[in-house]
Amino acid sequence: NSNITIDGKISSDKVWSNVKPITSLTQITPNFGSPISEDTQIRIAYNDFYFYVSVICFDSSPEKIQVGDSRRDAALNDEDSFLFIIDTFNDQQNGFLFGTNSDGKEFDAQINNEGVGNRSSNRQQGGVIGGTNINWDASWDVAVEKGSYGWSAEFAIPLRSIRFSPGKTKTWGINFQRNISKNTEIA
């Protein structure tokens, strides 16, 4: 129930040291089904007000980490980045997408209909790409730290910024993605 200081410094934070990391990411490209080429540690925590995610993106060549456009909601696909979708209703249809790069760029979007989108032109709006609405901007925080190990990021998402069913015992879905540009890798 404690608050986490959002500063990107994960290894020195006592709260994160008590959370077992998720480490098994699988490549989508270039080697579908193979383990991710660089170690990645993801941790999740929450309290009554925030949903927290931390990631340590280890990199054997941190000098090769690439960063692209720094504008909010600019695409993160062609740079070193980390993204996740929270499926608060666990329906595998809708969710909230958050991401960043090693410079701390904010990326967020609302996912509808598995991201497939609405085919009716009268319902499409600017900023909607398929079923991904990048015009949706929540209030949340992210901080990053770079080092000889690679980079790390901490996210704090206010629960009031996302929709979910009330109740104490709810199951949410979550999906993570790490992009490693030097390997043209998505995991």
Predicted stretch roles:
Residues N1-A187:
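Structural preference for beta-rich elements and adjacent junctions enriched in aromatics
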